[in-house]
């Protein structure tokens, strides 16, 4: 579960490395946000590359929206099948729910597929679990 003030890794190549959650937008539960939920984050650490377009560049202190891809708590599926990740990871999105980066690193849980707005994130992911 992701709560306010949680530090998360960024799983795309948008330039941000670590972000901190400041608000839960579309949370599926009252306890915290899970896989597939949208949150508002602030960039804590970023890497500025010279070949990134200005529209895709993310700077330290910038407020963005993000969708949760993986959590340490994990996801329970039918038949007592349980999936966990080693880190809490997000992908940064714009106001049209399209990813800012052009590549996603690591696997993405299938529960993101429930929300049809994030179909582009699933299509650019390396592995879908």
Curated annotation (Swiss-Prot):
GO cellular component, one term: mitochondrial large ribosomal subunit
One GO molecular-function entry: structural constituent of ribosome
Pfam families listed in its UniProt record: Ribosomal_L14 (PF00238)
Predominant location: mitochondrion
Keywords (A to Z) from UniProt: Mitochondrion, Ribonucleoprotein, Ribosomal protein
Subcellular location: Mitochondrion
GO biological process: translation
Entry-linked InterPro entries: Ribosomal_uL14, Ribosomal_uL14_sf
HAMAP family (alphabetical): Ribosomal_uL14
Family the UniProt entry places it in: Belongs to the universal ribosomal protein uL14 family.
Protein name: Large ribosomal subunit protein uL14m
Species of origin: Acanthamoeba castellanii (Amoeba)
């Amino acid at each position: 579960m992701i709560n306010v003030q949680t530090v998360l890794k960024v799983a795309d190549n948008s330039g941000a490395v670590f972000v901190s959650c400041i608000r839960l937008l579309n949370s599926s539960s009252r306890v915290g946000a899970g896989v597939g939920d949208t949150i508002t984050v602030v960039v804590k650490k970023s890497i500025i590359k010279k070949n990134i377009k200005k529209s895709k560049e993310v700077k330290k202190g910038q407020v963005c929206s993000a969708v949760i891809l993986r959590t340490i708590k994990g996801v329970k599926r039918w038949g007592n099948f349980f999936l966990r990740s080693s880190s809490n990871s997000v992908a940064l999105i714009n106001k049209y729910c399209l990813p800012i980066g052009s590549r996603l690193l690591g696997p993405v849980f299938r529960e993101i597929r429930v929300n049809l707005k994030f179909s582009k994130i699933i299509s650019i992911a390396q592995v879908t679990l």
